[in-house]
Amino acid sequence: LTVTLLGDLKNGRTTHSLVRLLSHYGVRVNFVSPPSLAMPREVIREVVKHGMAVYETSNLDEVIGTTDVLYVTRIQRERFASQDEYEAVKGCYVVNNDVLARAKPDLAVLHPLPRVDEIDPEVDFDIKRAAYFRQMRCGLYIRMALLAMVMQSSDRS
């Protein structure tokens, strides 16, 4: 299984925890980001130590054809000291139907949401590939179950 993480990999808590989890399952991971938003070196060292194969690039086209799961993150304005820094990387990756045309037919596109402009709304209509709404729905049920477990264990105390 090849998972590609795309976007702001430096500041995204979800990308850091996801790649750490995946490092226990023999998954190959591609990191695609602008150099200024690359996955932190300490995270890469940690997952490589677990035997994970990683590849870093700033070019999505290099890896989209071999990707099984595309995990897209937004580039957040609040992470930049100036508007100019943000403008330099804003919109550098947009997943749209043209990108999906170069991808595997069974590619799953995930996103932690909310999104800005990194996934074109036209992708929403690709029911098979646009898995982020299913991801959101399942995440709701997971959080409900975790809260129920925590509440039950606190009742026993």
List where the protein language model places each region.
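Glycine- and other small-residue-rich loops at beta-strand/loop junctions that grip anionic moieties
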Residues: L6-D8, V32-P34, V89, P112, ...
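Rossmann-like adenosine-cofactor binding region
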Residues: R45-V123
